[in-house]
Structure formats: structure tokens, C-alpha cells
Design a protein with these regions (language model features):
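Conserved GNAT acetyl-CoA-binding A-motif
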Residues: 106-108, 135-148
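A short beta-loop-alpha structural element at the N-terminal edge
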Residues: 4-18
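Active-site rim helix/loop that mediates acceptor-substrate recognition in acyltransferases
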Residues: 32-54, 59, 68
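Glycine-rich phosphate/pyrophosphate-binding loop shared by adenosine-nucleotide-utilizing enzymes
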Residues: 3, 61-66
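Conserved acyl-donor/pantetheine-binding loop and adjacent beta-alpha core of acyl/acetyltransferases
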Residues: 68-112
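Helix-loop element at the rim of GNAT/NAT acetyltransferase active sites that forms part
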Residues: 18-33, 45-46
């Protein structure tokens, strides 16, 4: 199967929301009754505030993954918190000192999700390559993400390092990970 990556267009956001709903609970599906609110919270700010920083992975003409991002988290967070109810954010589990370090030393951030049946086929790697090429062009020095259980293995293989970790509930570890743009 051939997987390719392209910048998202206005017509792709429904599919991005579908993939988010099927992968948003630490890589597993979000409960059907909660999907609309979940995708609204996690996707809408990127769709409305930074749509040009989103890519999709496509296989057999279907969206199988996406990466939403921003080059400047401090500016994005200020705008997002003015425009929307910020609600829960995984970064809020980390101390202010950790958040400030992430946002200033590693100013870009992103979310990446790939449907379970397509993991291991290179979609995540291709999405990251697209992001990092754009970050390089924009002269952004580094990026961060907060990942849940199990996904940190992929990001470690992609040369991300753990800056901090926290367990907000027993059995769940969130990791703040960073990687410079070389």
C-alpha cells in the first residue's frame, strides 16, 4: 500500500475529525457519545486558527492519519484561550516551569494520530518529515508534544527525548517530548 502526505485542505477536516475520534483515546477510539465534543475540543482550534499547519496521510484515497501543529505555542495558546473554552489540556498536568520551557525552548507543538490498521506503514514518519521541513523553512528551532501511553516508543525512534513525565491517574503516564529542527 502506498501512503503519501499532503497539506490538509478545507475539505479534509471531516476526515481529520473521524481519525481523531477513532484514535484520540491513547490511540484507541473515543466513546461514540463523546466523539463530537472530543473532536471539537482537540481539532477546532487548529482548523480555525492554524489550518495551514496541518497535514494528512492518505492511502487508497482515504485519510488514514493527520498531524496538526503550530509554530509558536505561546501565541497559539493565547489566541486559543481567548477564542475558546480551553477545557482540559494534557500540558496542564505539567508544572508551569515545564510548560514554559516547552513553549519557549521548543516553540512548535503538534498532535499526530494514525488509524490502528495503518500504523507501521510509514504514515507517522512521513507526517513528521512534512512538519519538520516546514519548521526548517520557518526557522523554528524545535518542537514538542505530549504523548500518552505507548506512543512514546515511536517518538523515541524518531529522535525525540523525554523532557518530563507525569502520571495524572494511576496507570497512565504522559510524556512531554522534544526534538530540535536540525
Amino acid at each position: 500500500m502506498n501512503v503519501w502526505v499532503q497539506r490538509a485542505t478545507a475539505g479534509d477536516w471531516r476526515e481529520i475529525e473521524r481519525v481523531c475520534g477513532q484514535t484520540g483515546l491513547a490511540g484507541s477510539p473515543v466513546d461514540e457519545a463523546e466523539r463530537a465534543a472530543f473532536t471539537e475540543h482537540w481539532i477546532r482550534p487548529y482548523r480555525e486558527l492554524r489550518p495551514d499547519w496541518t497535514w494528512i496521510a492518505v492511502c487508497d484515497k482515504a485519510v488514514i492519519g493527520y498531524l496538526t501543529s503550530v509554530p509558536d505555542t505561546l501565541a497559539f495558546e493565547a489566541e486559543r484561550r481567548r477564542a475558546y473554552d480551553p477545557g482540559p489540556d494534557s500540558r496542564d498536568f505539567f508544572s508551569e516551569a515545564v510548560r514554559r520551557k516547552l513553549w519557549t525552548e521548543h516553540p512548535a507543538h503538534f498532535m499526530l494520530n494514525v488509524l490502528a490498521d495503518y500504523r507501521g506503514m510509514g504514515a507517522g514518519t512521513k507526517l513528521l518529515h512534512a512538519l519538520y521541513a516546514e519548521l526548517r523553512r520557518a526557522k523554528v528551532p524545535s518542537a514538542h508534544l505530549v504523548c500518552g501511553p505507548n506512543s512514546h516508543f515511536f517518538f523515541e525512534r524518531m529522535a525525540f527525548r523525554v523532557e518530563a513525565s507525569v502520571s495524572p491517574v494511576p496507570g497512565v503516564t504522559l510524556r512531554a517530548m522534544t526534538r530540535p529542527v536540525d
